[in-house]
Design a protein with these regions (language model features):
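C-terminal and inter-domain tail/linker signature
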Residues: 1-96
């Protein structure tokens, strides 16, 4: 059971980053729990999928980013995970 929880968490995280790299916001949102808490560096915490969707729409208008060299770390029980990556991108518009 633990191995399947680990694999399920890893698959969800991989699906999220695949959607991110494809610019598929709906696919990203499908990977999130309804009560997601998005902690932005140098910003306030956004709570809920709707707030995260608003953030994604804003970012898509200002930036084009791809995440490369992705490494996913998952606890054995699947309850905690982290990802490491390198961001490659460009500015599309001045961020207000």
């Amino acid at each position: 059971m633990i191995a399947s929880a680990n694999a399920a968490s890893r698959a969800t995280i991989h699906a999220y980053f695949t959607a991110f790299n494809s610019g598929d916001i709906a696919g990203m949102l499908a990977c999130l729990a309804p009560d997601v808490a998005h902690h932005v560096n140098e910003g306030q915490v956004r709570h809920g999928v709707e707030k995260f969707a608003e953030f994604c729409a804003h970012m898509s208008a200002s930036y084009s980013e791809t995440l490369k060299d992705l490494v996913i770390f998952v606890a054995e029980d699947g309850e905690r995970a982290a990802a490491e990556f390198v961001v490659h991108g460009r500015y599309l518009a001045t961020d207000p």
